[in-house]
């Protein structure tokens, strides 16, 4: 089924009332993480693209001011994107979530932020442990691309369960669920 919404073409991913992703039938609405595809300029997206002046400025910053860094990230992405997209597909999560890694770490598994977030998915230690990563003086699984991607999927599912909206879940991943909840209360 296809509908039009705000200049985007929307395609649902199930037919006949059965909730499906690929050949898998899903049980319960909470397990259906990929509900539709959004088509914009001939490209399919799991999460709608919002045209906004701030988004345009951020894109300009990446393509002009930080062009060299962006190119490095694109080159690194070839090592990780196939694995990340395959894992997202297997979990029924939007494939567009793979692009979060570009924002979080520029596809650098050794990245460390000023807030001590580490790895591709930039987990702080407490959140990493909360979602199953071993972090101690001998091992730091935040730097393991496979294990950190599995933990990121658990965390993103958790956030989607709270917010039931991918843009909000992504914002909460970046700045914390409490911060997004507080801002949601202010702007409701």
Task: Give residue ranges: language-model regions.
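Soluble non-cytosolic domains of exported or imported proteins
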Residues: 64-79, 91, 95, 118, ...
């Amino acid at each position: 089924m296809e509908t039009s919404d705000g200049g985007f073409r929307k395609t649902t991913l199930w037919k006949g009332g059965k909730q499906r992703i690929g050949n898998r039938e899903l049980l319960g609405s909470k397990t259906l993480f990929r509900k539709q595809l959004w088509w914009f300029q001939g490209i399919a997206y799991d999460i709608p693209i919002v045209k906004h002046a701030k988004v345009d400025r951020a894109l300009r910053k990446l393509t002009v001011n930080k062009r060299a860094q962006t190119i490095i990230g694109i080159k690194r992405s070839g090592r990780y994107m196939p694995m990340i997209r395959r894992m997202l597909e297997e979990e029924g999560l939007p494939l567009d979530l793979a692009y979060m890694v570009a924002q979080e770490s520029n596809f650098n598994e050794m990245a460390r932020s000023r807030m001590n977030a580490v790895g591709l998915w930039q987990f702080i230690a407490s959140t990493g442990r909360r979602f199953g990563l071993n972090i101690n003086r001998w091992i730091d699984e935040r730097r393991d691309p496979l294990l950190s991607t599995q933990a990121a999927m658990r965390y993103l599912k958790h956030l989607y369960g709270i917010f039931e909206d991918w843009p909000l879940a992504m914002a909460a991943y970046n700045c914390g669920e409490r911060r997004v909840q507080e801002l949601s209360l202010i702007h409701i």
